[in-house]
């Protein structure tokens, strides 16, 4: 019974990109996640609140390592896709400045499940977050930076062994009048800092709402 529940691919959220949110992670990687010890021992029964306790203990991001073992980061991302928290809760995850791996996890979730305009509006301010992160690959653990991870989420096709859904560029969205053009670099920096400040101002609401 426990093994059946661990392999439950359903999601509590609505379809994202015309599929179950959990199916945004490929079948092979999904199978490896639900077969992993971390998933079975640390992810079973998590909700939007208790997942935070796991996420703040993360020491690196990444997809798979060693003999194609899924990282704790990718297991929690899959659990997040199962839980499918409300957008306000994801914003609260992003608003806690001291927990950079939680912020990276929430940013990844946004990229996978939110619409193109929301992705740009939510992730672009994080390009001003230059803190160091560790990333685990097949052969090593190396340093990267949160802004570089966010840039990859906005521009790359594959991040942490996950193929990202198509994302229209900022320029395309501006041409469609769905996004306002970016202002000058100094104004843009001020706007980004203001957006991050707004995110962080929600920090006090986390305990009340998740």
Curated annotation (Swiss-Prot):
The keyword tRNA-binding does not apply. This is Pre-mRNA-splicing factor 38. GO terms for biological process: mRNA cis splicing, via spliceosome. Component of the 25S U4/U6.U5 tri-snRNP particle, a subcomplex of the spliceosome. The gene is prp38. Its main location: nucleus. It is found in: Nucleus. It comes from the Eukaryota. The keyword NADP does not apply. Required for pre-mRNA splicing and maintenance of stable U6 small nuclear RNA levels. Implicated in the formation of stable and biologically active snRNP structures. As part of the U4/U6.U5 tri-snRNP particle, dispensible for spliceosome assembly, but required for conformational changes, which result in U4 snRNA release and the subsequent catalytic activation of the spliceosome. Keywords: mRNA processing, mRNA splicing, Nucleus, Ribonucleoprotein, Spliceosome. Residues 181-210 are annotated as: Disordered.
């Amino acid at each position: 019974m426990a093994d059946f529940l661990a392999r439950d691919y359903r999601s509590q959220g609505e379809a994202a990109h015309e599929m179950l949110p959990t199916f945004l992670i490929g079948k092979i990687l999904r199978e490896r996640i639900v077969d992993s010890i971390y998933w079975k021992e640390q992810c079973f029964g998590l909700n939007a609140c208790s997942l935070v306790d796991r996420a703040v203990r993360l020491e690196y991001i990444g997809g798979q390592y060693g003999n194609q073992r899924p990282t704790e980061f990718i297991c929690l991302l899959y659990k997040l896709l199962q839980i499918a928290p409300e957008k306000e809760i994801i914003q609260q995850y992003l608003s806690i400045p001291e927990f950079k791996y939680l912020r990276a996890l929430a940013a990844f979730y946004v990229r996978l499940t939110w619409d193109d305009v929301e992705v740009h509006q939510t992730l672009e301010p994080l390009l001003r977050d230059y803190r160091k992160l560790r990333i685990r690959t097949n052969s090593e653990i190396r340093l990267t930076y949160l802004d570089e991870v966010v840039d990859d989420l906005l521009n790359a096709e594959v991040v942490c062994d996950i193929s990202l859904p198509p994302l229209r560029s900022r320029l395309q969205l501006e041409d469609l009048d769905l996004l306002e053009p970016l202002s000058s670099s100094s104004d843009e920096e001020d706007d980004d800092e203001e957006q991050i400040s707004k995110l962080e101002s929600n920090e006090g609401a986390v305990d009340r709402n998740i």
